[in-house]
């Protein structure tokens, strides 16, 4: 990455991920104007527990003018917890196929999606079609559905490059279609 870059991209993986699903998306969105980071975290822990460490890493970066966070699945939960944490820097938070209304996370971790966001933060939800998403299609509800007025919501199509657009392919589709300018 360019050492003088004023913009950063932070990718945050989901549960039980080794990160392979991020190779194509990060190659697609990485450019000479940004520094790109992949944040690894222990997904056996509640997402709230890693926010102080992630925030410390972000705030330690100097002269940053724009932050773009891309969180997939449980990584989207982590990303959502930054909505009220980053101040004074233009920030985009993109949650991709994220179980923001997960009853399990609420039950075991006390997770509740934030109800507000800072004014410098733009929030984007990229939702898969539940019946095509093997992480969600066995549930009796769609864990992606939350009511957050200050967000832009996009429903992904049913196919990507001729294949079913499910949970993991959602990151690649977003990488091909996102506008990071």
Name the predicted role of every residue range.
Residues 9, 35-36, 62-64, 82, ...:
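Generic preference for hydrophobic/aromatic residues in regular secondary structure cores
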Residues 19-25:
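The serine-hydrolase catalytic nucleophile loop
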Residues 112-181:
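C-terminal catalytic-base region of ester-bond hydrolases, centering on the histidine
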